[in-house]
Curated annotation (Swiss-Prot):
Keywords: Cytoplasm, Methyltransferase, RNA-binding, rRNA processing, S-adenosyl-L-methionine, Transferase
Gene: rlmL
Lineage: Bacteria, Pseudomonadati, Pseudomonadota, Gammaproteobacteria, Alteromonadales
EC number(s) stated in the UniProt entry for this protein: 2.1.1.173, 2.1.1.264
GO molecular function, one term: 23S rRNA (guanine(2445)-N(2))-methyltransferase activity
Organism name: Colwellia psychrerythraea (strain 34H / ATCC BAA-681)
UniProt-recorded name of the protein: Ribosomal RNA large subunit methyltransferase K/L
Amino acid sequence: MKESTQQFLALTSPGIEVLLFDEIKSLGAFNVIQKPEGVYFQASLALGYKISLWTRLATRIMLKLGEGEAKDKDELFKAASSINWPDIFKSTTTFAVDFVGYSEEIRNSQFGGLTIKDAIVDQFRDQGFERPNVDKKAPQISFQARLLRDNVTIFLDFSGRGLFQRGYREHSGAAPLKENLAAALIIRSGWLNDTSKPLVDPMCGSGTILIEAVSMAAKQAPAINRQSWGFEAWLSHDNAVWQKQLTLAIDSSEENMSNLKVKVFGIDIDERVLRTAQQNARNAQLHQYIEFTCKNTNDMDNTFGQPGTILFNPPYGERIGELPELVENFVLFGQKLKMQFKDWRIAILTANVDLLSMLKLSSFKRYKFKNGPLDCQLALYNLDAKQGAKDAINPQSDFAEEDSAFANRLKKNRKNLKGWLKSNEIEAYRLYDGDIPEYNVAIDIYGEYLVIQEYAAPKTIEEDKAKKRLQEVIYWAPKVLNIPTDKVILKTRAKQRGANQYERLEKTKQSLTINEHGALFKINLWDYLDTGLFLDHRKTRQIVAKKSQGKSLLNLFAYTGSVSVQAAVQGAASITTVDMSNTYLNWAEDNFALNKLNGHKYQFIQADCLDWLKKNVNKFDVIFIDPPTFSNSKRMEDSFDVQRDHVDLITDALKSLNRGGEIFFTNNKRNFKIDFEALDELGLTAEAMSDVTRDKDFARNKHIHNSWSIKRTAT
């Protein structure tokens, strides 16, 4: 008699669906259909058990219980009620409902799940059973409802917790690769076509790819050691049929292991992570088939025998500071491959496809995957005679320093500034500022650190070209300047409006100290787009400080108070520092403390500078004003535009200026035009200072800032 079949749904990660379709068919399922949400198939109960034990690519196996229209809450409740729940599980069994999808009437998963839960509980109560309890954290049985186009399908979570959890991984690295994705990568790499050839993971982390590969080569059932299953509390579960399938899977796996002969190698630079990989391999009882070595990938030599496959999942360079080292590693790794790994297959998974260009190799195939929330590609390369033929003797010629216009310009700029830097004892300066339009970056030096700021490419530049140029910059800058890649910080700078330039990027709370003309400044290169010190105003700080000796200074829009600090160090009589941000005002106080400056003559005021200036009754000898180009902060009643409002700002500042006093006014608005006529009506004379306040490292950029000295007109 033919066994009755039921409909199942196998879920997986995006990019794996096609492979899962093939796998489910190969395991004997009927009517296999691939859809965006997963792979549907018909199977007997025995085959459902078998597929759950043998699938490597599914994350879950779901068993269909029923379906129905669900345009609104009432229809959803009715569809859930059409299933006889006391036939599914006992009232003493805890349960949970997961809901996927939404519609105009059913707008969130919590509402949908609650409606189905109510239908289940009501049905038990109406049939005279005890009310079953919900347990969201550790239910004994789980259900999933999937809403699509006003139709809901309700499933039993047949397999239970994620099938990718094989049970051998106790610990993992910072960015673990799920086992089902690792299996998909192994299939796509082609290594399974001939497992007698070596497989190498040069950045093996916790060993997932290697353990999964050995298990696949041995034709093991991946779930035979699983301790719990979703169907165990299901009333139609047939334990005799299940035990038969489990025994068959165990026996088959043990028999296949006896014939296993593989050469698999794992390499990682992190000894701690490598110990984890070794323990995971022991847990999987596959440690004897994997040779682990602790070393840098770029120190890896080809001692693996015949050509095989290199498959790995390198870091993606998502965090500040990671990318420069990765760029260099990819360049070196590409050179290593050309020199030592002829006729090998290379497979690399990355979310940063731009890094692949640094290999200087041509991929013959790319597959799209999702690694968690990240869009990734698996790039495949065959290192045949065509790959790198022009560089067979000297692969480094791909990156010849003498051929790089950017590298040559960097060396030229460094040479031009060398004497000036030495004579002025300058620790923080700009070395490059978009000198070559194709390399649209700014490069700053802060002591032993290198900061690369990528300017957003104009729309006329192709995105791929801009990314390629940036990779060259990241590669060459630390090399030319002899700065280790772990001392390189990369930032992207688009046009900033208002307070955007002060938004937090990271939360490292790291800082370093920079000395500028005898004043010490706290610098943070990691957490914000700007560092706490505007380098282009180095000379401005000197001029204002000298003008303020023995005088009172008001510093408006003070940021981290660098002008105030320099003035205090050089002997200002009193200083009032005003800024709207508590964060930056605290930073200003840190700068004062760093220079051992304290006392009542230094005041720090957190306020909207525009509003404070209107109410201020004190007078100052020198006023420094460096407003934003535009601001509409939540703390401000009105917006501020420096072109539109600069006369009003200076008018208000004039009321706080002592007779014989001086206002230093500066801003960063390109094409700014000061209103001389309006200032003249106020009895003021403005002297352009921009050429004077630009120091040598900013001499190439005449638009970096605008500055004026404003005084009352002599009568």
